[in-house]
Design a protein with these regions (language model features):
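Short aromatic-glycine-(Arg/Gly/Cys) micro-motifs in beta-strand/loop hairpins
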Residues: 1-16
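Short, mixed-charge low-complexity intrinsically disordered segments
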Residues: 16, 36-69
Length: 69
C-alpha cells in the first residue's frame, strides 16, 4: 500500500508523531481532530500533506492564539 497523505504533529518544533495513510478522508479526519496545543509547552503545529506536495498547517499557542496556513 502506498501512503500518499501524512499528518505530522510537532510540539515546540520537535516531531512527536507522523501518521501516513493512503486515503484523503482518513487524513482529513485525523487533522481536524487536532484542536489544541496538546502536551506542548509553548505551541503545537499540525501539518497535513497531500500527494501534490501541498501542505496545510495549523498552529495552536498556549495563549489561545491559532494560526492556519
Amino acid at each position: 500500500m502506498e501512503y500518499t497523505y501524512s499528518v505530522t504533529t510537532l510540539y515546540d518544533g520537535e516531531l512527536v508523531n507522523t501518521l501516513r495513510v493512503s486515503d484523503m478522508m482518513t487524513a482529513v479526519d485525523a487533522w481536524t481532530k487536532c484542536v489544541d496545543c496538546g502536551d506542548a509547552k509553548e505551541y503545537a503545529t499540525y501539518n497535513l500533506s497531500d500527494p501534490t506536495g501541498k501542505m496545510y498547517t495549523k498552529t495552536f499557542y498556549r495563549n489561545g492564539e491559532v494560526v492556519m496556513r
